[in-house]
């Protein structure tokens, strides 16, 4: 044998012609083999491997594929015990989205201080179902919450699409990208694991929760407890705030001895904001009946639906919430919200419902 050449891309080209991303991956693979060889030969027992910005020059799919393997937990792997510890420092939500929750450490500037603090999730006791839910939840889009200066948790896509627009129209300085605020939809009403993730015992990232009142008798998520279970809450939303969210935000000393009403009253001071009905209904009641009618007409050719929204535009007081929400759901809440946001932007008016204004004021104060 006179020459030995390592080929890549199915043998089409040599290593010298590799892209920077491919070269980085090859280098890491060779380093891993080297460390394993040293252990096998008894020259080393353990290796501590630090990788700075591993996402460099790799497209998103490869980032997730490669580092899912690097970051796998002992339980997920049938391989023998690891002979190395890996530290990744990253700005990539793709890498963050495949990291086990218990392995995450977030470094952030301490509010009002001139130093950096590290927050780890290793000490937060999530039950197995909540942990798995969170790891599934934190996809590439939501993975940005690890890098956020502030987070607003909402129930669905309608709020996620509309909130940045409503905030900017309310106050031009409320540019979420400039402020580092992420709006994260939890896709339901089970806020508890996410409150624990972001709260004082978790990452301690400033956050607010926006949730619906959902009066008794309305169709709501099956994640919610029935208000009649304890005979106290007037709605699913009130029960959700007190029994599911606030118990994770108040200290045991502050929680003990408090009545349901006292805890509910304290919610806004902890960044939890409840509307009067549901997001779409509250937004409609902020003098936006014409914008809602224009949105429906732009998304569907259903004449009866057009007539209903024309009637609402002429007299908003005749609103039937059930039919109203049914019509919006028929075209898709997310699609409706995106079109409505563009109409709001074209109009340029401040149409922010009061509970959202309160949440925005809360976030501004936290990030000041």
Task: List each model region and its residues.
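Acidic, divalent-metal-binding catalytic cores of TOPRIM
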Residues: 99, 105-368
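Switch/communication elements of ASCE P-loop NTPase nucleotide-binding domains
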Residues: 5-141, 168, 344-368
